[in-house]
């Protein structure tokens, strides 16, 4: 922060026109891949201005803010699941004992799906049977997408009639053979149905909880015809399971 203040003190940031990102702020910029890409641009600009920085110094911060849920690989296709950002809405006023309250809808979460070595003409990535709008990152065979889902169902939330979407089942589907090559599952809570009674005491316990909620099995059996991938023109990187 001090380096940025010093850099702008010497050379104020005075563009002719600020970029209007529109819905991209709630689409690709919520995914850790593009957050890190944007951060590396900032580090490069600081180095050009005479402030020696290395983006690898901040790799632990990336892992802490966007923890890895798990990965899966089959036939040279590597799939990685990682936490992403999800802004929560503040609801309207509701009656509460002794007055009124405004609850926060914390039931929604977002997960990043990143794939390497994917031939998009033949294979597709699905979440709960729905094909993901995988977008190229600019690297051959590398694609990324986000999944927005309801993790739990509190008494006060937007769209109260929409149920919980977990566990999330991800499949690597062969479109030609109409079958899943394999897949993985991610559970938001304990897969056995238990409720965590206390908060994790440190980062190691939190990581162990995440790892026990991820399984490298549990793909969809039988014939799968995923059909055509539907992409929202306003949110091309995001699959919102609430709209399915």
Across the structure, where does each feature detected by a protein language model lie?
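C-terminal accessory/tail domains of diverse enzymes
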Residues: 1-244
